[in-house]
Design a protein with these regions (language model features):
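Glycine-rich, basic loop-to-helix element that forms the pyrophosphate-binding segment
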Residues: 61-79, 89
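Short, acidic, metal-binding catalytic loop of nucleotide-sugar glycosyltransferases
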Residues: 22-30
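Cell-envelope/extracellular polymer assembly enzymes that use nucleotide-activated donors
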Residues: 2-4, 32
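Short aromatic/hydrophobic "clamp" motif used to bind/position activated sugar donors
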Residues: 84
C-alpha cells in the first residue's frame, strides 16, 4: 500500500461524502482511507458508515470531540503504509 489518507471529521455533513468520493475517484487505488469521527451530531457519521464495506476503508468513531490533533494521531496510529496524507473533511482530491 502506497499511502494512507486520514480525514478527521466533526460535523462535516456538507463536505465529507464528496471528500471521500474524490479519493475513491482517483486512478491510483493503492491507498487506505481512514476517517476519524470526533462525535459528530449531524449526519456525517452516518455518511462515513456507508463506506465501511469499501476496500481499505477504516472508520474510527469517537463518542465525543477528542480534538483535531488527537484524531489525526489516531488515524496515523492505524496507518498501514509508509506515507500518510492528511485531508480536512472539506478537501477534495483532483
Amino acid at each position: 500500500m502506497k499511502a494512507t489518507i486520514v480525514i478527521p471529521n466533526i460535523n462535516g455533513k456538507g463536505w465529507l461524502k464528496d471528500s471521500i468520493e474524490s479519493v475513491y475517484a482517483q486512478t491510483e487505488q493503492d491507498f487506505e482511507l481512514i476517517v476519524v469521527d470526533n462525535g459528530s451530531t449531524d449526519e456525517s457519521l452516518e455518511q462515513a458508515r456507508g463506506y465501511c464495506t469499501r476496500p481499505n476503508f477504516t472508520l474510527i468513531e469517537n463518542g465525543y470531540n477528542t480534538g483535531f490533533s488527537h484524531a489525526v494521531n489516531q488515524g496515523i496510529a492505524r496507518a498501514r503504509s509508509e506515507f500518510v496524507v492528511l485531508f480536512n473533511n472539506d478537501a477534495f482530491a483532483e
